[in-house]
Curated annotation (Swiss-Prot):
It is found in: Cytoplasm; Nucleus. Expressed ubiquitously. The modification Phosphoserine is found at residues 301, 312, 314, 338. Small GTPase required for proper nuclear import of RNA polymerase II (RNAPII). May act at an RNAP assembly step prior to nuclear import. Forms an interface between the RNA polymerase II enzyme and chaperone/scaffolding proteins, suggesting that it is required to connect RNA polymerase II to regulators of protein complex formation. May be involved in nuclear localization of XPA. GTP binds at residues 29-34, 189-192. Its main location: cytoplasm. It comes from the Eukaryota. Residues 326-354 are annotated as: Disordered. The modification N-acetylalanine is found at residue 2. The lineage of its organism: Eukaryota, Metazoa, Chordata, Craniata, Vertebrata. This is GPN-loop GTPase 1. A motif (Gly-Pro-Asn (GPN)-loop) lies at residues 86-88. One of its GO terms (molecular function) is ATP hydrolysis activity. Its EC number is 3.6.5.-.
Length: 374
């Protein structure tokens, strides 16, 4: 009933209409997968079945019904064999390959948003592989850019009874919060083994944590004491819930915190994402305008150079122009040229015929006078 009430409260408060994405992170052995299994069963029992995504390519069996399973897309063993990688390298490469198709996953989530109020994403056991990889960043930012996204950090309470180990977990939680910049919930799992009240006391009471540290005599305790002062402000705004993934206790409080985190996303994180998207769009449009302006200037320069070259070369005819000019002379000019040629030809012939005729007449007269004198 808590899940349904939280969802109804979220809708009534004008909260997000999209499904809330719960990105489950945690150290290996902290109980992430068991937590997702319990969460899935709880939501099914409440009549609000979640949309579940498994991003662990190395898991042998998934103990919950997954709508999308990375193992159906990427074969972890084949990736290791083909690229000659170890276990962690195989997980990173598998996530990288899957991230190239994550736009299709986003489309599936959008189609299912009317049927599912929550999207559960189970990540690989090697937390650093997902948190600090490029593919993990792509997946996280893709979800956060479209849907209310909450990071759930699952912590093994039974292994955090030592102040130094507890501080290490808190430092890792702080680094993930700083990296993702999303609403954050620390789930202290395995409360069926040990109650998480000691951890809450350490977070709220600095002196109680100092008393626990005084029992440690190693040099690490001095470093932990210094870091606890730095993280004191971090604790004040941190959402903490104690949960038993085996027994299912603490889930009601968890969904109350999820509702609060989703409202925080809509109130603080979504405007920031919209501002970033708008600034990126403005920068892109400005870049396009600058490119168009440079192109316009280049085209104007080319046109000006072409006009200058044409003016400077106008007295000189192109060979094609010469051919056209020779082929389009006026007929009168052609006839005049032809008549002139004929006159010149006749004048030349007459000039040669007149001396020959005079010689012929002289020879004839000479012969005539010669015959008469005889």
């Amino acid at each position: 009933m808590a899940a349904s009430a939280a969802a109804a409260e979220l809708q009534a408060s004008g909260g997000p209409r999209h499904p809330v994405c719960l990105l489950v992170l945690g150290m290996a052995g902290s109980g992430k997968t068991t937590f997702v299994q319990r969460l899935t069963g709880h939501l099914h029992a409440q009549g609000t079945p979640p949309y579940v995504i498994n991003l662990d390519p190395a898991v042998h069996e998934v103990p919950f019904p997954a709508n999308i399973d990375i193992r159906d897309t990427v074969k972890y063993k084949e990736v290791m064999k083909q690229y000659g990688l170890g276990p962690n390298g195989g997980i990173v490469t598998s996530l990288n390959l899957f991230a190239t198709r994550f736009d299709q996953v986003m489309k599936f989530i959008e189609k299912a948003q009317n049927m599912s109020k929550y999207v559960l994403i189970d990540t690989p056991g090697q937390i650093e592989v997902f948190t600090w990889s490029a593919s993990g960043t792509i997946i996280t930012e893709a979800l956060a850019s479209s849907f209310p996204t909450v990071v759930i950090y699952v912590m093994d309470t039974s292994r955090s009874t030592n102040p130094v180990t507890f501080m290490s977990n808190m430092l890792y939680a702080c680094s993930i919060l700083y990296k993702t910049k999303l609403p954050f919930i620390v789930v202290m799992n395995k409360t069926d083994i040990i109650d998480h009240s000691f951890a809450v006391e350490w977070m709220q009471d600095f002196e109680a944590f100092q008393d626990a540290l005084n029992q440690e005599t190693t040099y690490v305790s001095n470093l932990t004491r210094s870091m606890s002062l730095v993280l004191d402000e971090f604790y004040s705004s941190l959402r903490v819930v104690g949960v038993s993934a085996v027994l299912g206790t603490g889930l009601d409080e968890l969904f109350v915190q999820v509702t609060s985190a989703a409202e925080e996303y809509e109130r603080e994180y979504r405007p920031e994402y919209e501002r970033l998207k708008k600034s990126l769009a403005n920068a892109e449009s400005q870049q396009q305008r600058e490119q168009l302006e440079r192109l316009r200037k280049d085209m104007g320069s080319v046109a000006l150079d072409a006009g200058t070259a044409k003016d400077s070369l106008s007295p000189v005819l192109h060979p094609s122009d010469l051919i056209l000019t020779r082929g389009t002379l006026d007929e009168e000019d052609e006839e005049a040229d032809s008549d002139t040629d004929d006159i010149d030809h006749r004048v030349t012939e007459e000039s040669h015929e007149e001396p020959a005729f005079q010689n012929f007449m002289q020879e004839s007269m000479a012969q005539y006078w010669k015959r008469n004198n005889k």
